[in-house]
């Protein structure tokens, strides 16, 4: 693969590309092995250029957002990893907000507030990117991205730019079509309603205070680990199983909110994954409830 990597680097000298880059520098858990190549494009043409070069050199492509709801395995990721955080422009026009994929959801909700637009208050404390939020239909406190998104501009596997409507994105709970078709979200368009700025700010502050009171924001974590199973809430299930505070290596079921796993220091991705599996097995054994990860898990599996 070394010759392929060298050829790729030769073709992309004008783009910020790092080799053997530890992804623990980027993930919210502070865990994860290296990427063979990590690219930080600043524009759509650069993204398209990267895809062309990767395909020419038969390099696998992985796109990640803000890495807030992500676990990268300790052996890292083969080929090219693209992080879009440098593509973070947000534009407010009337009641429409258009945000590039690398823009933060928090920053996008703040931009909406600055235009006295209501609808994204629920997202005021979600640490992910717009692209990641579209990818997984991120949500909190009764709201989801699909509630306000009208369309998304995507880059297909054939390197073609397309616009998909809300319906075409096939949203459901923590799911979108992007998870199935391998496309890259480039930007999202949100249609909002005019509101009263102080009321919007009050709601955002209220939800942020609730988040701070209930979530373990003082430690690195990957956010909500499991999807909510039908008829149950994850945190109480884990508490009832006696797993709150349970620790494997440096990864611990949060003592503040059992639906979170925090890095108490020196955790590895393997610690996280071992603890996740243990929780799943225990909950199934005790309650016959299957917990499905909400967190995205990627990277090379150990032999």
Swiss-Prot record:
GO cellular component: cytosol
Signal peptide residue numbers: none
Pfam family, one: FAD_binding_4
Gene3D superfamilies in UniProt: 3.30.465.10, UDP-N-acetylenolpyruvoylglucosamine reductase, C-terminal domain, Uridine Diphospho-n-acetylenolpyruvylglucosamine Reductase, domain 2
Record's keyword annotation contains Phosphoprotein: no
UniProt pathway: Cell wall biogenesis; peptidoglycan biosynthesis
Catalyzed reactions: UDP-N-acetyl-alpha-D-muramate + NADP(+) = UDP-N-acetyl-3-O-(1-carboxyvinyl)-alpha-D-glucosamine + NADPH + H(+)
Compartmental location: Cytoplasm
Known EC number: 1.3.1.98
Highest taxon of source: Bacteria
GO terms, biological process: cell division; cell wall organization; peptidoglycan biosynthetic process; regulation of cell shape
InterPro entries membership: FAD-bd_PCMH, FAD-bd_PCMH-like_sf, FAD-bd_PCMH_sub1, FAD-bd_PCMH_sub2, MurB, MurB_C, MurB_C_sf, Oxid_FAD_bind_N
Gene Ontology MF terms: FAD binding; UDP-N-acetylmuramate dehydrogenase activity
Ranges where the FAD-binding PCMH-type domain occurs: 30-195
Key words, A-Z: Cell cycle, Cell division, Cell shape, Cell wall biogenesis/degradation, Cytoplasm, FAD, Flavoprotein, NADP, Oxidoreductase, Peptidoglycan synthesis
Catalytic site: 174, 224 (proton donor), 294
PROSITE patterns the record matches: FAD_PCMH (PS51387)
Cofactor(s) this protein requires: FAD
Keyword Signal: no
Functional note: Cell wall formation.
Family membership noted in the UniProt record: Belongs to the MurB family.
Protein name: UDP-N-acetylenolpyruvoylglucosamine reductase
